Curated annotation (Swiss-Prot):
Transmembrane segments: 470-490, 508-534, 548-568, 573-593, 609-636, 694-722
Keywords: ANK repeat, ATP-binding, Calcium, Calcium channel, Calcium transport, Calmodulin-binding, Cell junction, Cell membrane, Cell projection, Cilium, Glycoprotein, Ion channel, Ion transport, Lipid-binding, Membrane, Metal-binding, Nucleotide-binding, Phosphoprotein, Repeat, Transmembrane, Transmembrane helix, Transport
Ranges in the topological domain labelled Cytoplasmic: 1-469, 535-547, 594-608, 723-871
Taxonomy of the source species: Eukaryota, Metazoa, Chordata, Craniata, Vertebrata
Protein residues bound to Ca(2+): 682
Residue numbers carrying Phosphoserine: 824
Source organism, top-level taxon: Eukaryota
Residue numbers on the Extracellular membrane side: 491-507, 569-572, 637-665, 686-693
Cellular compartments annotated: Cell membrane; Apical cell membrane; Cell junction, Adherens junction; Cell projection, Cilium
Species for this entry: Rattus norvegicus
Organs and tissues of expression: Expressed lung, spleen, kidney, testis, fat, and at very low levels in trigeminal ganglia.
Post-translational events: N-glycosylated.
The protein, known as: Transient receptor potential cation channel subfamily V member 4
GO process terms (BP): actin cytoskeleton organization; actin filament organization; ATP export; ATP transport; blood vessel endothelial cell delamination; calcium ion import; calcium ion import across plasma membrane; calcium ion import into cytosol
Amino acid sequence: MADPGDGPRAAPGDVAEPPGDESGTSGGEAFPLSSLANLFEGEEGSSSLSPVDASRPAGPGDGRPNLRMKFQGAFRKGVPNPIDLLESTLYESSVVPGPKKAPMDSLFDYGTYRHHPSDNKRWRRKVVEKQPQSPKAPAPQPPPILKVFNRPILFDIVSRGSTADLDGLLSYLLTHKKRLTDEEFREPSTGKTCLPKALLNLSNGRNDTIPVLLDIAERTGNMREFINSPFRDIYYRGQTALHIAIERRCKHYVELLVAQGADVHAQARGRFFQPKDEGGYFYFGELPLSLAACTNQPHIVNYLTENPHKKADMRRQDSRGNTVLHALVAIADNTRENTKFVTKMYDLLLLKCSRLFPDSNLETVLNNDGLSPLMMAAKTGKIGVFQHIIRREVTDEDTRHLSRKFKDWAYGPVYSSLYDLSSLDTCGEEVSVLEILVYNSKIENRHEMLAVEPINELLRDKWRKFGAVSFYINVVSYLCAMVIFTLTAYYQPLEGTPPYPYRTTVDYLRLAGEVITLLTGVLFFFTSIKDLFMKKCPGVNSLFVDGSFQLLYFIYSVLVVVSAALYLAGIEAYLAVMVFALVLGWMNALYFTRGLKLTGTYSIMIQKILFKDLFRFLLVYLLFMIGYASALVTLLNPCTNMKVCNEDQSNCTVPSYPACRDSETFSAFLLDLFKLTIGMGDLEMLSSAKYPVVFILLLVTYIILTFVLLLNMLIALMGETVGQVSKESKHIWKLQWATTILDIERSFPVFLRKAFRSGEMVTVGKSSDGTPDRRWCFRVDEVNWSHWNQNLGIINEDPGKSEIYQYYGFSHTMGRLRRDRWSSVVPRVVELNKNSGTDEVVVPLDNLGNPNCDGHQQGYAPKWRAEDAPL
């Protein structure tokens, strides 16, 4: 039964009006615009009604004005969009515009009417035929509309994070048999898919389209390909969605990607991810684990190495052979904050690798350059990481084999530490950290790194064992060789042609001197070849700075050998070569000044002035000389071939410079200009100048620019260089002193190196497999007033007691406390230098706090002896 409140029902064949007021407010079912589209069809100009329409009886709906009359402006030519008139007309209708959507969501939108500019057809309305309509029949469902997606539309949707706009994407892909990894959905320049695009456009760390995209990729059957699709351009080549999720610090997306099969060993090798010195911006080791470590995300590091899906192998190396530890060393910059997190992450990874892979030590892995993380830290000057590695002390028994520092014994503030010398001092078997620090001149702070314990004490021990004696023997030997060379050159015969006969005793002494000089030249030749071309750390800068004396010795040896060859060949020009060798040989004696602190900085000053200040001065001065010489020589009158005779016609000569200009005038004039620069020249050539005024003007400007300006600038620059070297004289001498020690050690054969090797073989605990952990260690005795011996993992309970251990089946006894050197005291009390064979000095400890402690006074023995240890 019909409700009495219902409005009048339309007659069959009429269009029912919706209930409500005349203004068209919504009170019933809205008139769909898709049905309105059926009203317009036919050709242009067909405006008459059909016979059926003309003959139908009038109904209640006929009181409504004609549609063409109400839309008379919408059917005219030039009106682009009839929907504007539809929205602005006063026609009482319930047609409501649909919600506005993005322009690239689909090609058709219910609730709106779009008129494409290319479609210029005029429409006429179509008469709606009378259809019997059941009052309770459900409204017909609109036909399903298939949206169209392309790369711009898809990238715009994921950038906005709109999941609703992704409705229909799966149907579109399945219908057209497409996938999200197809080329049409990739960025042409980079090969980027929509997943990295979504990860790069997060809002508060989230983008709701990411799970939807992964679900669609799973349903289309290319989940792994979609997740692991890398960038393909040269700039970001190899980067995947997992790299981006880690860089954006989104652990939830990292977990989601790994759970769906992301490659945890994908390598980002693009130019952007290269070191700065190679044109890159941020090098992190290419691998996702290295990226998480280098961006200080320990929670992601733990997940990548311990997740149940696919664990990241911590031993994996990148294209440079670097592990995650190498990558951490590479990003260190010696600042406090950076060093703190790098060292903490370094220990976390090292200990984790030891627990996951007990048979492997991540710290011993070498990269393509043959460098371990410790060597890399030394070569790049990362002093914070370097000091942390060599002084690392692990107290946990399970991972104590990773320690490089062990406390042998402790008593109060005094403790004796054993430092592992592996990689630090290798006795020539392989590249050592000590050689890298000394011979690599690219390290600006290497003098600071040489002061780090145990490097500092290791150098002192080498100097005491063999360095000092060998150095002074070399000094005496070289001076004797140069004296012999000088006497041999001074007493060379002046008559006859070489080789000269040997008849008298003086001649035989000269022969002995020549043989000794030739042998020393050959010896220097081969040793210089070994040092220059077989050095472990070669380089042009290292050659001219650190290896300058080796280069000079090489030139000296070549001159000596060439001079001897010319002498034996009977060429008198051997004398010219010999005198150059003689001068260079005496200049090379400056090398031995580095053994003394008072004279060690002079050679450095000379090197810096020669290669820095004097080189720049000579470059500018040479340009000035050539320019002024060319101009002044041009002003001289050319010489003629006519002879000029005296008044009595007795002395006739052809005029030459300085009276005129001939072919050799330019070179002679350069020498005269140099004399003017140092204030020794004359003006004899002025009389032969064509324009004397111009000639004098040029000479005056030359003297002002060179003698007054350039020379004084050179003096000022040299004074500044000397001042800088003097400020750093201690560090510079320490570096030269270390270079001298290593030069002496490298000149020894292998068996002598091992005989003079510093340190001792010590059992420091148990290795990972339970066997005794025996290492070559170096002992450093230290004093620290700010940290006391509580809960220390010491080896010996009795301070200073001898330890007897077995080594290759033989019994060896370690010496007692060999060096009672108190260093690193905070505050520093005193520094002791051990004198071999004598008692140690008294250490005054008065006025260091309250002498009474716990009701009694604690004191120290008046003398601290190596034989009477402990205290």
